[in-house]
């Protein structure tokens, strides 16, 4: 075979981008779950790739692309050019480039399940699952769809993996979440869903942007060529991929804005991924207009699908993996049968003048793939559950998997994070800032007579956004010593409910600051009135002021006590 440099480079760049999707999935899942499980999430995503790579090399590639029959490929040995160097290789692409490209696709399907089973799965059990999906489940269905199997022989079209990758992972996630059961306190006794917010939506958003960026390689490089018509096709694929994701995101934003009275951040991020998943099967064979329609539909599917799975089926999916990958993977598969313009298929879609044939082919292939994954993953998860166990104990789940599964006190050591339990016998100290904005006093006022000036401590709990203005105001009234501590307040804003992924929030830990001031000469009431004037907005959450009597103050450096200990002298 004569190799093409441009085709080889294109495939290798695509493989590198698809590999980096692992970072995107890790960030999305970490951000959408609680801080006490962040390290566990990272380890699971790492192991998906590191277990899947050798397994796919040893067995999976042969099952998927080996010369066998319509049902399963024939394993001719480990994946080497000598064993599989002919047959299924794309034109001009060396075996090793094709192997790594297919390896990263396998790992992508495996990692989808991590989010749906987050925060309560045994790490060992998850590793066993990861091995099995890369060893058997994904390669066999992949052979049917991409390896010359009986589904592909029907005329089935799944260009980059809405069905073969995402729906397979999404259905596996659904089965795993069902068998595993919901997290502790996810549902009330009467079955009402409770919101369990992720600890870092910023990290989650970073993950979505990484995935969106890498999806251009996921879909674009699936041409496995940059010669002839593939050059034009690659550009079109980039456009349809981007358009579907963008339209889906806007659609979700509008839906949540109407339903929840505010645009939901995490659901909008899921909307981006839903659009990407839905367009993946037909990105080469649908028009930009059809891609936009697919984006709109995927936005509706992800919002109402996630709500249905959570509130009606009572299936706990912390990151929305089933709604994003399972439901939209299935929809994306069917969308080819609806919107294909015939440029990448032997038929046109139902809505583009091709009749029911193409839609029927897509529907049949989808149902067969779902049935395969449901049966195999049910067996795998049930065997794991009844042997080594699938779920951690209640004690381990409450404490957090970082601590119990990995011996990690916190993935954020050195930071004060909500939801991270403090190990027994230790304490977590929040950062403390001591502010002295004024110059040291040159002289000490005359010592007041006994009992004239008492010592008073004023404590203020408030939001951080007005801290600078507050410190300036305190300086102006003569308060020069202020201690500020980052704290977390537990509460809910009455009369203005907030929502997380469609579920009304009951109570949450909110970042606040605790300001401590000890005064003697400065009148307490003046401190209080100044604080009220600066911090008041009229909104719930402005804060509270607490006033305490102090028996004595001792300055350690000089030994001075009482009033003198408060004076900032040289």
Model-found features: residue ranges?
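Glycine- and aromatic-enriched membrane alpha-helices
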Residues: 1-448
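Positively charged, small/polar-rich N-terminal and surface patches that mediate targeting and assembly
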Residues: 404-411, 422-570
């Amino acid at each position: 075979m004569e190799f093409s440099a441009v085709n080889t480079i294109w495939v290798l760049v695509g493989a590198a981008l698809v590999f980096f999707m692992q970072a995107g999935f890790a960030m999305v899942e970490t951000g959408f779950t609680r801080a006490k499980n962040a390290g566990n999430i990272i380890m699971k995503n790492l192991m998906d790739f590191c277990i899947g790579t050798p397994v796919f090399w040893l067995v999976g590639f042969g099952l998927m692309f080996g010369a066998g029959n319509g049902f399963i490929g024939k394993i001719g040995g480990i994946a080497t050019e000598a064993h599989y160097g002919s047959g299924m290789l794309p034109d001009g692409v060396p075996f090793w480039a094709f192997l790594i490209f297919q390896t990263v696709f396998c790992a992508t399907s495996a990692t989808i399940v991590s989010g749906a089973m987050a925060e309560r799965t045994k790490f060992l059990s998850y590793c066993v699952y990861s091995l099995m999906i890369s060893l058997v489940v994904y390669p066999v269905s992949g052979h049917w769809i991409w390896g010359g199997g009986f589904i592909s022989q029907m005329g089935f079209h799944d260009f980059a993996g809405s069905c073969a990758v995402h729906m397979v992972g999404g259905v596996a996630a659904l089965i795993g979440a069902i068998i595993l059961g919901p997290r502790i306190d996810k549902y009330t006794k009467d079955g009402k869903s409770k919101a369990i917010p992720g600890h870092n939506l910023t990290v989650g958003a970073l993950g979505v942007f990484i995935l969106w960026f890498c999806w251009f390689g996921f879909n674009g490089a699936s041409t496995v060529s940059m010669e002839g018509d593939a050059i034009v096709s690659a550009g079109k694929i980039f456009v349809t991929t981007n358009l579907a994701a963008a339209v889906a995101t806007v659609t979700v934003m509008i839906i949540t804005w109407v339903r929840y009275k505010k645009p939901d951040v995490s659901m909008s991020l899921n909307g981006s991924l839903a659009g990407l998943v839905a367009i993946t099967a037909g990105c080469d064979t649908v028009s930009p207009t059809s891609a936009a329609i697919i984006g709109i539909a995927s936005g509706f599917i992800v919002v109402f699908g996630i709500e249905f799975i959570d509130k009606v089926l009572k299936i706990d999916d912390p990151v929305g993996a089933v709604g994003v990958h399972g439901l939209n993977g299935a929809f994306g598969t069917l969308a080819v049968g609806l919107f294909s313009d015939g440029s990448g298929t032997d038929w046109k879609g139902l809505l583009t003048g091709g009749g029911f044939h193409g839609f029927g082919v897509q529907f049949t292939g989808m149902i067969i793939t779902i049935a395969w994954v449901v049966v195999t993953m049910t067996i795998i998860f049930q065997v794991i559950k009844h042997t080594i166990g699938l779920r951690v104990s209640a004690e381990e789940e409450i404490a957090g998997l970082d601590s119990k599964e990995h011996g990690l006190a916190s993935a954020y050591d050195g930071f004060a994070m909500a939801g991270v339990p403090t190990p027994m016998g230790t304490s977590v100290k929040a950062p403390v800032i001591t502010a002295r904005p004024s110059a040291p006093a040159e002289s000490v006022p005359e010592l007041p007579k006994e009992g004239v000036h008492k010592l008073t401590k004023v404590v203020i709990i408030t939001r951080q956004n007005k801290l600078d203005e507050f410190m300036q105001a305190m300086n102006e009234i003569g308060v020069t010593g202020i201690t500020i501590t980052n704290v977390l307040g537990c509460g809910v804003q009455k009369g203005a409910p907030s929502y997380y992924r469609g579920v009304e929030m009951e109570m949450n830990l909110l970042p606040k600051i605790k300001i401590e001031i000890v005064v003697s000469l400065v009148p307490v009431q003046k401190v209080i009135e100044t604080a009220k004037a600066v911090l008041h907005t009229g909104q719930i959450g402005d804060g509270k002021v607490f006033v305490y009597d102090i028996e004595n103050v001792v300055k350690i450096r000089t030994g001075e006590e009482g009033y003198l200990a408060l004076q900032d002298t040289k």
